[in-house]
């Protein structure tokens, strides 16, 4: 499974990239807003740090506007992926952009049907939102399972990015299902390191070593 970092925080991207853990980055207008910086500047800096895919989202709601924005965004760097919402206009844009060799990430996927439509339109990636489904009492991980089954059955090459990841279980379970990517907030990625037995083990090793030195 590939790990994307779901953030526009450049310092956090540098931190985790130095550990060899960042295969790509996903951003959205809300994440960019948090940084209080120019949109294009942030995307350009992220692309200079991370060599993998960097998703940048369009703001327009019509296909023509999305395509226009996409063509400006891909000028930033060759690893920019255009993030487009799951709408009819969005799929029209995805169809055109994919034929021009521009990579796309269809976002706000909440059903297997939506994922299938995006794949048929030519999306490079689809991003089903597991956490938001959990929030309304539905099973977000079940959606990942359904999408993986359908894509596997038909040999669909569109990659599945597990998005709206809220806790480590989302990562573990989607990895078991064979999802291609999890895009993870940095606070959740931090939690993947943690286990109480690891801490206990380190403490014991240090205590034993200290006792050995005092002999």
Curated annotation (Swiss-Prot):
UniProt-listed CDD domains: Transaldolase_FSA
Localization (cell): Cytoplasm
Record GO biological process: carbohydrate metabolic process; pentose-phosphate shunt
Name of the molecule in the record: Probable transaldolase
Reaction(s) catalysed (UniProt annotation): D-sedoheptulose 7-phosphate + D-glyceraldehyde 3-phosphate = D-erythrose 4-phosphate + beta-D-fructose 6-phosphate
Swiss-Prot/TrEMBL keywords: Cytoplasm, Pentose shunt, Schiff base, Transferase
Coiled coil: none
Cited PROSITE patterns: TRANSALDOLASE_1
Family per record: Belongs to the transaldolase family. Type 3B subfamily.
Species, as recorded: Methanococcus vannielii (strain ATCC 35089 / DSM 1224 / JCM 13029 / OCM 148 / SB)
Domain of life: Archaea
One cellular-component annotation, GO: cytoplasm
InterPro entries xref list: Aldolase_TIM, TAL/FSA, Transaldolase_3B, Transaldolase_3B/F6P_aldolase, Transaldolase_AS, TSA/FSA_arc/bac
Function: Transaldolase is important for the balance of metabolites in the pentose-phosphate pathway.
Gene Ontology MF term list: aldehyde-lyase activity; transaldolase activity
Entry keyword annotation includes Magnesium: no
SUPFAM superfamilies documented for this protein: Aldolase
EC number: 2.2.1.2
Biochemical pathway: Carbohydrate degradation; pentose phosphate pathway; D-glyceraldehyde 3-phosphate and beta-D-fructose 6-phosphate from D-ribose 5-phosphate and D-xylulose 5-phosphate (non-oxidative stage): step 2/3
HAMAP family associated with the record: Transaldolase_3b
Catalytic center residues: 83
């Amino acid at each position: 499974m590939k790990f994307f970092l779901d953030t526009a925080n450049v310092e956090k991207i540098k931190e985790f990239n130095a550990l060899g853990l960042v295969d790509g980055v996903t951003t959205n207008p809300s994440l960019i807003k948090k940084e209080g910086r120019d949109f294009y500047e942030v995307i350009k800096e992220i692309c200079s740090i991370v060599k993998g895919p960097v998703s940048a989202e369009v703001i327009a709601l019509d296909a023509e506007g999305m395509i226009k924005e996409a063509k400006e965004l891909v000028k930033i760097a060759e690893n920019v992926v255009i993030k487009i919402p799951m709408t009819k206009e969005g799929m029209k844009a995805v169809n055109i952009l994919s034929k021009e060799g521009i990579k796309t990430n269809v976002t706000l996927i909440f059903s297997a049907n939506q994922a299938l439509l995006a794949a048929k339109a030519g999306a490079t990636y689809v991003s089903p939102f597991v956490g938001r489904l959990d929030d309304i009492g539905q099973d977000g991980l079940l959606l990942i399972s359904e999408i993986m089954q359908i894509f596997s059955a038909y040999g669909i090459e569109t990659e599945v990015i597990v998005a709206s990841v809220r806790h480590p279980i989302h990562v573990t379970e989607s990895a078991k299902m064979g999802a291609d990517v999890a895009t993870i907030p940095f606070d959740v990625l931090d939690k993947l390191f943690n286990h109480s037995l690891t801490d206990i083990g380190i403490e014991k090793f240090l205590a034993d070593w200290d006792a050995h030195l005092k002999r």
